[in-house]
């Protein structure tokens, strides 16, 4: 399975964003060796995503989060569906304007993509987690409805 962590700080917080991100990653590192990634939202509301096909220890010193970041997601992955050599499959996953991380398995994701007429965000995407974010994108503003589709 995977490891997930995150934070949400006000702009006024003096917590060092990079130190916090590295501490979170170190805390979940043993949960996934196939890939690692993080996403943060800056004060301009733009979401920046970084990910790579390595374990957390090879990535730890590369994390650099600006002090203006208010939210962060960190993910380490042991793949179950979708091989980490396809960069888009590694988390965080972006589908349209939605960025997220997930720990678990969705057995019927291919059927649900087809049933809702939703295309994968990128060629070669096969990871089941993308379905959650695709439904959230499709049914924006109707979260309960989107989750019921799962």
Predicted regions and their residues:
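Conserved short alpha-helical segments that host acidic/polar catalytic motifs at enzyme active sites
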Residues: 1-150
């Amino acid at each position: 399975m995977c490891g997930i962590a995150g934070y949400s700080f006000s702009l006024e917080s003096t917590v060092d964003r990079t130190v916090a991100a590295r501490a979170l990653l170190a805390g979940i590192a043993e949960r996934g060796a196939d890939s690692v990634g993080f996403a943060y939202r800056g004060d301009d509301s733009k979401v920046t995503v970084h990910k790579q096909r390595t374990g957390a220890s090879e990535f730890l010193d590369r994390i650099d989060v600006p002090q203006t970041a208010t939210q962060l997601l960190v993910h380490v992955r042991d793949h179950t569906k979708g091989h980490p050599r396809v960069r888009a499959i590694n988390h965080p996953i972006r589908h349209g304007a939605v960025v997220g991380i997930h720990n678990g398995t969705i057995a019927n994701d291919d059927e649900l993509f087809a049933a809702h007429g939703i295309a994968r965000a990128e060629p070669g995407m096969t990871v089941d987690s993308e379905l959650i974010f695709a439904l959230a994108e499709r049914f924006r503003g109707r979260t309960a409805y989107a989750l019921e589709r799962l």
